[in-house]
Amino acid sequence: MAIRVYKPTTAGRRNASVSDFSELTRSTPEKSLVRKLSKTGGRNSYGRMTSRHRGGGHKRQYRLIDFKRWDKDGVPAKVAHIEYDPNRSARIALLHYADGEKRYIIAPEGIKQGDVIETGAQADIKPGNNLPLRNIPTGTVVHAIELRPLGGAKIARSAGAAVQLVAKDGAYAQLRMPSGEIRNVDARCRATVGEVGNSDHANIQLGKAGRARWMGKRPITRGESMNPVDHPHGGRTRGGKPPVSPWGKGEVRTRRPKKASNKMIVRRRPNGKNRK
């Protein structure tokens, strides 16, 4: 993948860039593998806003991605197409299995049309092949990793994501996450060899607010610029207040401190200036 930078012909084009989509081989999805996708606008079933700054955006169809490949052990598949998926940053690959079934998977870096993909403990160590962590050599880069055996891929699914298998200790495998955290995962869990493709996605510049709106993202307004009736930070009085939400709630961590899987973390991710 490469990045195409626009010439500054207008204010919106200045500093804007897009993917050149050169790796794609088809523009329309497989009809049997798409489903309707309804928009919520950040509202729940009561119509109340539960997620701010969401709404609008282009219509999308959801592509059914196979995150549980264990039921295809021993069945080879050929990569029929590399396609765009509007619901994720990574590209997706359409596989045609030898038994006639078609499925989508996350497209790894380096995969191309016509490649043969395998699944199972005896599969070769090459990008796109899926096998248990206990059968993967130490030092290998993997993605689409299960947290529980047969639970489906949960970790490292976005563009450019890569996790390194650093050690094996009995029933567990140690993985170095993109954040730098090292954690134990059951060695029976499956992973796909290689890193996720489309790694240049992080370098794309939207260039204008309109492109964010096409993606369903609405503007963010600072609480300090509002009136007191709208936000605790509103009005001319400044300082003396800890940051809070519009409803007066302080900063809330998104991870429970007593989460059961904490015991699987060998080393926490580096913080602040120690992060690389």
Swiss-Prot record:
- What cellular component GO annotations does this protein have? large ribosomal subunit
Q: Which keywords does the record carry?
A: Ribonucleoprotein, Ribosomal protein, RNA-binding, rRNA-binding
Region entry Disordered: which residue ranges?
35-58, 218-276
Classify the source by domain of life. Bacteria
Cross-referenced Pfam families? Ribosomal_L2, Ribosomal_L2_C
For the keyword RNA-binding, the answer is: yes
Which InterPro entries does the UniProt entry name for this protein? NA-bd_OB-fold, Rib_uL2_dom2, Ribosomal_uL2, Ribosomal_uL2_bac/org-type, Ribosomal_uL2_C, Ribosomal_uL2_dom3, Ribosomal_uL2_RNA-bd_dom, Translation_prot_SH3-like_sf
Provide one Gene Ontology biological process annotation: cytoplasmic translation
Q: Name one GO molecular function term.
A: rRNA binding
Regions of compositional bias (Basic residues) in chain numbering? 255-276
User: What is annotated about its quaternary structure and interactions?
Assistant: Part of the 50S ribosomal subunit. Forms a bridge to the 30S subunit in the 70S ribosome.
Function per UniProt = One of the primary rRNA binding proteins. Required for association of the 30S and 50S subunits to form the 70S ribosome, for tRNA binding and peptide bond formation. It has been suggested to have peptidyltransferase activity; this is somewhat controversial. Makes several contacts with the 16S rRNA in the 70S ribosome.
Q: Which family does it belong to?
A: Belongs to the universal ribosomal protein uL2 family.
**Which named protein is this?**
Large ribosomal subunit protein uL2
Supply the source organism for this entry: Bifidobacterium adolescentis (strain ATCC 15703 / DSM 20083 / NCTC 11814 / E194a)
